[in-house]
Amino acid sequence: MKHFQFLVLIFLLFQFNFEVALGNPDSSDSDSNDDSKPVNVAYQNAYYEVKSGNFQVAIKYLKQAAKSSTNKADIYNLMGYSHRKLDLLEEAFFYYHKALKLDPRHKGANEYIGELYLRTNNLKKAEEHLEVLDDVCLFGCDEYDDLKDAIEKYKNSM
């Protein structure tokens, strides 16, 4: 019976939809079945703008979202991502560090700061964030795979 329960648990874990690296606005800080929790419209707008490649607009929405949201790690991760895509690397580092200070195990922030470290030729720091993801992603995750692939490409280009 214990083996059956274990198999059911494993099955359920694989069926569970883990958050995407950017932090899906529909699952970030509100329960979809709980209408009493406010939806952060600014964060949802920012997420849409990031997906559309409108990073300057996304940053404006993210600044609004940061004023009222309790899920600041996701917001700062998107801020870092948006700044990185605009080649504002110092600002990107600043926001990724803020996200990781709030949530050191944030998958998206660890992946993206690792990629940013590769962009600034700091392989050692990128590998440190890969180790964090290895610990966080017990059954593997896209963030780990993406950073691992980026590190391999970086090493092959040397």
Feature names for model-found ranges:
Residues 38, 72, 106, 140-141:
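Residue-level recognition of tetratricopeptide repeat
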